From Swiss-Prot:
Signal peptide: none
E.C. no: 2.1.1.199
Catalysed reactions, semicolon-separated: cytidine(1402) in 16S rRNA + S-adenosyl-L-methionine = N(4)-methylcytidine(1402) in 16S rRNA + S-adenosyl-L-homocysteine + H(+)
Single GO MF annotation: rRNA (cytosine-N4-)-methyltransferase activity
Phylogenetic placement of the source organism: Bacteria, Bacillati, Cyanobacteriota, Cyanophyceae, Acaryochloridales
Major subcellular site: cytoplasm
Keywords carried by this UniProt record: Cytoplasm, Methyltransferase, rRNA processing, S-adenosyl-L-methionine, Transferase
Binding residues annotated for S-adenosyl-L-methionine, in chain numbering: G38, G39, H40, D57, F84, D100, Q107
Family the UniProt entry places it in: Belongs to the methyltransferase superfamily. RsmH family.
Protein's name according to its UniProt entry: Ribosomal RNA small subunit methyltransferase H
Function: Specifically methylates the N4 position of cytidine in position 1402 (C1402) of 16S rRNA.
Record-level GO cellular component terms: cytoplasm
EC main group: transferase
Species per Swiss-Prot/TrEMBL record: Acaryochloris marina (strain MBIC 11017)
Domain of life: Bacteria
Length: 298
């Protein structure tokens, strides 16, 4: 079935801050490691007529949406489908690299993708739908202990063991609604009522991270990506929860090729938070590629 690009509606976050921090070059080459619907790439391409972008995404629906959005600049952008951790630029070196992590609003808003408990759909959660493992596979085949560990480590869910025990007793679970109900029924009544978020929020986050191996691929990407930058080039990464942000922060500090630009993360303005609720948890960090001794002399 051909994806419908028009149905992939995603509002990019921290766009102004991202463009300012990249310090765009007139003839620069940029890597958008998570092109999504193409919002950030469109802004990069709009700055200068000779700027070029290589755009990656593992989600074919996102990639097709970006192709449609950026059609007028098709001579200045190349697309590649796959996870950013498996991309190889060859001899190319970039003036800037950006990544907007996590699940997009467009993915959450498409019921058939199975990311959200707001819709009744099959438990899927695959960003790359060609991969085998689904959320249903994890929920229905993993041991109680493994499920509890996933919920605790990836969702920071304090009732992880209680929830895992209930899930195992109720298996098989096939839909997002099935899972959300079981999670909600696992919590002590008073605790569930006092939560500011839906009782299943942390479990769904943890499950999505596990299905897509989000933290593992982020670590791999952030270790190799600095070698793709030209000296003076910048990498900017937007994260949406503390687990991602911690990885970005630590790797930026520890990588000898990088100098941290943002001592503290950049967050959305109050106006952007009002206009786009997804931006409330967004954190943007920048680092700059430092020249090696032989590069400084050349």
């Amino acid at each position: 079935m051909t994806p419908d690009p028009g149905a992939f509606n995603h509002i990019s976050v921290l766009s102004h801050e991202l463009m300012a921090g990249l310090m765009l070059q007139e003839q620069g080459l940029y890597l958008d490691a998570t092109v999504g619907g193409g919002g950030h790439s469109a802004l990069i391409l709009s700055q200068y007529p000779q700027t070029q972008v290589i755009a990656l995404d593992q989600d074919i629906q996102a990639l097709e949406a970006a192709r449609a959005k950026l059609h007028d600049a098709c001579d200045r952008i190349q697309f590649w489908q796959g996870n950013f951790s498996t991309y190889h630029p060859g001899e190319l070196r970039f003036d800037g690299i950006i990544a907007d992590l996590g699940v997009s609003s467009a993915q959450l808003d498409r019921p058939e993708r199975g990311f959200s408990f707001r819709y009744d759909a099959d438990l899927d959660m695959r960003m790359d739908q060609s991969q085998g493992l689904t959320a249903a596979d994890v929920i229905n085949t993993y041991s109680e202990r493994d499920l509890a560990d996933i919920f605790y480590h990836y969702g920071e869910e304090r009732f992880s063991r209680r929830i895992a025990r209930k899930i195992v007793s109720k298996r098989p679970l096939r839909t997002t609604s099935d899972l959300a109900r079981v999670v909600a029924s696992s919590l002590p009544a008073a605790k569930g009522r006092r939560r500011r978020i839906h009782p299943a929020t942390r479990v769904f986050q943890a499950l999505r991270i596990a299905v897509n191996q989000e933290l593992q691929v982020l670590e791999k990407f952030i270790e190799i990506a600095p070698t793709w930058l030209k000296p003076g080039g910048r990498i900017g990464i937007i994260s949406f929860h503390s687990l991602e942000d911690r990885i970005v922060k630590i790797h930026f500090r520890q990588n000898s090729l990088l100098q941290v630009v943002t001592k503290k993360p950049i967050v959305a303005s109050e106006q952007e938070k009002r206009e786009n609720s997804r931006s409330r948890s967004a954190k943007l960090r920048f680092a700059e590629r430092v020249p090696l001794a032989d590069e400084a002399e050349s």
